[in-house]
Each structure stands twice: as structure tokens, then as C-alpha cells.
Amino acid sequence: MSRRCELTGKAVQVGHLVSHSNRKTKCRFLPNLCNVTLQSDALNRRVRLRVTAHALRSVEHRGGLDAFLIKAREIELSQTARLLKRDIEKKIAETATPAAA
């Protein structure tokens, strides 16, 4: 399991811890990952994802998982999230078509 957010693509960063005397020590900065279950309103089911705390706030800000995935860029998403995005877009298209007829 990689240390990468499935929704935003945030991953491990490498840098230095710098002391007062300016000595540098290599350090890994890990993302704040959480295992969460999010509700998809369009698919009417729950989805388990491994996301950062920052991504959770973004999902809430955009109005839920469906709205977040529709606006998200494909490059940042994991394979699971890409498949989920396609399923949501198909379901929304299906529900919009009969209403127009």
C-alpha cells in the first residue's frame, strides 16, 4: 500500500531538518493519511478510500464525494477513484436522460 492520497495525489516528500547551527539531517515528510468510508449519493453506496485529512476537508467543501470527483482532474486520482468517477458520471447521465424525455 503506497503512502499516496487516492483523491489528491499527495505523497511522501523528502527534505531536511535544519538545526540552529544549520546542520541538515535528511527527513521524510509523510502525508496525514486516513482510511475513510465515504457515501456516494449518485451510486447510492459507500466507498472505502485512503485519503489525506486535506482531501477530506476538500470533499466536504465541494459538497460530497460525487461533486469532488466530477471536478477532479484524472491525473491526480488513483485507479480506484478514476473508475468511481466514470461510474458516477455514467449514473448521472442515465438519470438526466429520462427526465428530459
Swiss-Prot record:
InterPro entries: Ribosomal_bL28 (IPR026569), Ribosomal_bL28/bL31-like_sf (IPR034704), Ribosomal_bL28_bact-type (IPR001383), Ribosomal_bL28_sf (IPR037147). The keyword Lipid metabolism does not apply. GO terms for biological process: translation. It comes from the Bacteria. The keyword Mitochondrion does not apply. Keywords: Ribonucleoprotein, Ribosomal protein. Disulfide bonds: none annotated. One of its GO terms (cellular component) is cytosolic large ribosomal subunit. One of its GO terms (molecular function) is structural constituent of ribosome. Belongs to the bacterial ribosomal protein bL28 family. This is Large ribosomal subunit protein bL28.
